[in-house]
Amino acid sequence: MARSVPLEKVRNIGIAAHIDAGKTTTTERILFYSGVVHKIGEVHDGNAVTDWMEQERERGITITAAAISTSWKDYRVNIIDTPGHVDFTIEVERSMRVLDGVVAVFCSVGGVQPQSETVWRQADRYSVPRIVFVNKMDRTGADFFKVYGQIRDRVRANAVPIQIPIGAESDFQGIVDLVEMKAHIYTNDLGTDILVTDIPAELQETAAEWRSKMVEAVAETDEALLDKYFEDGDLSIEDIKAGLRKGVLIQGNDRLVPMLCGSAFKNKGVQLLLDAVVELLPSPQDIPPIQGTLPDGEVALRPSSDEAPFSALAFKIMADPYGRLTFVRVYSGILQKGSYVYNATKGKKERVSRLIILKADDRIEVDELRAGDLGAVLGLKDTFTGDTLCDDQNPIILESLFIPEPVISVAVEPKTKNDMEKLSKALQALSEEDPTFRVSVDSETNQTVIAGMGELHLEILVDRMLREYKVEANIGAPQVAYRETVRKAVKAEGKFVRQSGGKGQYGHVVIELEPAEPGTGFEFVSKIVGGTVPKEYVGPAEQGMKETCESGVLAGYPLIDIKATLVDGSYHDVDSSEMAFKIAGSMAIKEAVRKADPVLLEPVMKVEVEVPEDFLGSVMGNLISRRGQIEGQATTNGTATVSAKVPLAEMFGYATDLRSMTQGRGIFTMEFSQYEEVPRNVAETIIAKNKGNA
């Protein structure tokens, strides 16, 4: 079966931004103007197409990355609408991994917010080309050029306006297209009647100035264009469009980031945004081939072509009335309904029963997915987020996703004993869908513990248990994910010897333990020479150390950011075994940690609070009382913004306190920043409590 749309006319894009910048509304307008929906949905009415979960419609925030297919002109545009709330960072992360381009939406009033910076960093991690849409130009305090300055300063992007607004706030009438040097004036409320005319006289000088900056930036992307620019002092419209597209695809800090503007809510600027998506953002063919690892450890590339061997990445699992949906991005080859695929990550074959593409709530069955397509597979039982699917004759493992560690946990139990089985089924299904949601059983208390990225994250998952799985649950008080580490380098040994008739046990290792770089977890290196510890016992010794690191010596929290080097040891020809060396490894690491000045670490959050200026003093005082460090403050149009680093342990219940301090007018965002050492007096209390002495 031939392709319905040529690969060069496919665009896989994400719409990403800070909470409340207007992403979902922008997506809704794109669907309206491209003909997928015939009535505009509003987030605040609770009927947006992409917000299809009940909680999303109630809360007016987007939680899961809904994938929708639409068309513009003769292009197919696959859109993923991502959440802006920091508790749902994994949704943004997984969409960035499978996209070719991003529309970053910024509020013209709020500008670059902490979550915008997080999203930008995620796009940087996967080197995703992007364009910027400065939304809400009709709002009081709208300032396109202020946002331009913030994007250049705060996320260090090479931003290039290709439009400027005509008016602002209630006087926002339209847009100047700097490429064509024409004004687009919107003459009706639906944004369908557009008058393309000359630029108003009062804006001509400003437009000429910004066009000149744009042309200069475009010329610098290509030597031939630069020569033309020096000769003629200008570039043709065709040259500008070609140069912009080339500039967007540059890898690294010189990449151009074209800036557009509009008001999705007032239906202004969305068609021009769609034009920019198809003209400037890449097709699957324009991005570098996906890289993976072959079974022999060699690195291989898979070109985005139907003829190449099949490879795809599973980027999301979702429970659905249809069945278990596995969302995939096909990078190469063709995936057919009814075929068998090889899960290279798990080493298992699975059968594809059906293939579907989504238009929000609508499921459309298809016979195949081709290179560059996004779709969902039914029938896969053992495939999870981050797994590679491929042709078993040409196995490959693609680079997986970066999955952040949870920072908060709570104990959970069903309200009635009869619901125990339903609870465990619900927890299993939810943890399959969301890799940042972890479920474990506390070995001492036998309680089920759930962990996630924040209070809202866990609250929504508990809510889903009730709505989707009909399980009522009691939730304990939130617990902070403390960690332990060491502060100095030491040498220690572990010797396990047991001789009591019959076969004995003998394992002996000597290790050096030292602090490692933050974020490295547990690192192990073997420097054994001369066979003092045979190769087959090095792995078990490492395993023993790793398992022991799951429970530290101070308060039983996992040990992180440590490096253990195996330097010496001894063995017995008859009595040595894997188990003996595993125990010796465990003994060595325990001994080393005790000697290496162990300390307690706590998650510290990056907090940004926005409040009316009058409340600034009390809000700052409150943050300081929570062991917060103020990192900066700014005031714009009577609104003060405070940035601080605050331990997560001090942030529980902050939303309620902020509301009462500011008469409900304060808002805040919070995201994980880093682990830091807990002050001694606080650490003593935590350690005593954990040992049952509090």
Swiss-Prot record:
NCBIfam families: EF-G, PRK12740.1-3, PRK12740.1-5, small_GTP
Keywords from the named record: Cytoplasm, Elongation factor, GTP-binding, Nucleotide-binding, Protein biosynthesis
UniProt xrefs under HAMAP family: EF_G_EF_2_B (MF_00054_B)
UniProt name for this protein: Elongation factor G
CDD domains per record: EF-G, EFG_III, EFG_mtEFG1_IV, EFG_mtEFG_C, EFG_mtEFG_II
MF-aspect GO terms: GTP binding; GTPase activity; translation elongation factor activity
Highest taxon of the lineage: Bacteria
Binding site for GTP: 17-24, 81-85, 135-138
Keyword Nucleotide-binding: yes
All copies of domain tr-type G, residue ranges: 8-285
Location in the cell: Cytoplasm
Keyword Nucleotide-binding: yes
Family affiliation: Belongs to the TRAFAC class translation factor GTPase superfamily. Classic translation factor GTPase family. EF-G/EF-2 subfamily.
UniProt xrefs under PANTHER family: RIBOSOME-RELEASING FACTOR 2, MITOCHONDRIAL (PTHR43261:SF1), TRANSLATION ELONGATION FACTOR G-RELATED (PTHR43261)
Task performed by this protein: Catalyzes the GTP-dependent ribosomal translocation step during translation elongation. During this step, the ribosome changes from the pre-translocational (PRE) to the post-translocational (POST) state as the newly formed A-site-bound peptidyl-tRNA and P-site-bound deacylated tRNA move to the P and E sites, respectively. Catalyzes the coordinated movement of the two tRNA molecules, the mRNA and conformational changes in the ribosome.
GO cellular component, one term: cytoplasm
SUPFAM superfamilies in the cross-refs: EF-G C-terminal domain-like, P-loop containing nucleoside triphosphate hydrolases, Ribosomal protein S5 domain 2-like, Translation proteins
Listed Pfam families: EFG_C (PF00679), EFG_III (PF14492), EFG_IV (PF03764), GTP_EFTU (PF00009), GTP_EFTU_D2 (PF03144)
PROSITE patterns linked to this entry: G_TR_1 (PS00301), G_TR_2 (PS51722)
GO BP annotation list: ribosome disassembly
InterPro entries reported for this sequence: EFG_II (IPR041095), EFG_III (IPR009022), EFG_III/V (IPR035647), EFG_IV (IPR047872), EFG_V (IPR035649), EFG_V-like (IPR000640), EFTu-like_2 (IPR004161), G_TR_CS (IPR031157)
SMART domains: EFG_C, EFG_IV
Source organism of the structure: Synechococcus elongatus (strain ATCC 33912 / PCC 7942 / FACHB-805) (Anacystis nidulans R2)
